[in-house]
């Protein structure tokens, strides 16, 4: 079971073969998203809206498709995830989004799929980089 980081989804949307090929190589029912990923995408949409409304609209449609397609596989920030986030944040400074995704993976026993493996270094979770396969 996999927890896919935002960068993998974004790169697949842009047509990057490494991300697309990896996503196509696994059973789609084993792919999960974090609510943090939805928030990161929404942040990108809000920023894009300031300068390029048509692009923001296209991203909004993509976000809604993701929400629909993964509706049963979007993992929340629960109390257990929050506690694990606190432990990870105390170990070393890292971005809040990455730490929450890492904590979600720990609690739900998922493999993180990301291009940014260094963001998840020194956690006790397995990581796959589709660009290194």
Task: Locate predicted features.
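Alpha-helix capping/helix-boundary segments
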Residues: 8-9, 37, 81, 100-101, ...
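Short, well-structured N-terminal submotif of metal-dependent ribonuclease cores
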Residues: 1-37, 47-65, 133
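Active-site neighborhoods of divalent-metal-dependent phosphate/nucleic-acid chemistry enzymes
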Residues: 43-48, 57, 68-115
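Residues at the C-termini of beta-strands that transition into short coil/loop
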Residues: 35-36, 78, 116, 131
